[in-house]
Amino acid sequence: LSGICHSIENDLIYRGGGPIFYKHFSYKLDVEKNGRVRDRSDIDQNMEGLAAYVLKASTMRPGDVLFVGSVSGRTASVVDLAYEAKKMGIKVIAMSSMTYAKAVDPVHSSGKKLYEMVDLTLDNCAPAAEAMMEVEGIEAPYAAASGIASDYILWSVTSVAIEELMKRGITPGILKSANFPGGNEYNKTVVEPNYEKYGW
């Protein structure tokens, strides 16, 4: 999972009821410096070329599945990640808003947006500019739509994936709540033998 939403990734990864086959994937370029503080947000989001090096240095392999999230689908680094992952034989699924993506221009040098680079796009149906609500006296809308929608979609996908694995005779590791009696002990029996050997 990369860039979906911190709260959603936390809702899926390492929590009670969550499968162990999901792992967080993130990266950034950090340069040691003694100069003045500079806002790097625009640089980090629109830097092309870094994804290829990051993927080669990662443990991802052909046949793995990478979920990539960007509501607008135009951020260059996200598009670059999807492009480079596909070149490696990784299946790429996007979580994006088609309404938003079609309302903005691409930033990536290919002239493409995220949904045009992936194997499958899950449309979270967020409006352009993301938010749903408006109030008189405030120019910006509020209440982002993508979080709730993406959470629902990803848990639906997860449920289908678990059912499909079971049909194939594969029992995926599902974590119990650490706050439930015996939860931690059970989780050790699931994570250590399953994930390290099989990835599920």
What are the residue ranges of the model-derived segments?
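Active-site phosphate/pyrophosphate-binding segments
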Residues: 17-18, 163-200
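Glycine-rich phosphate-binding loops that contact phosphosugars or nucleotide phosphates
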Residues: 3-159
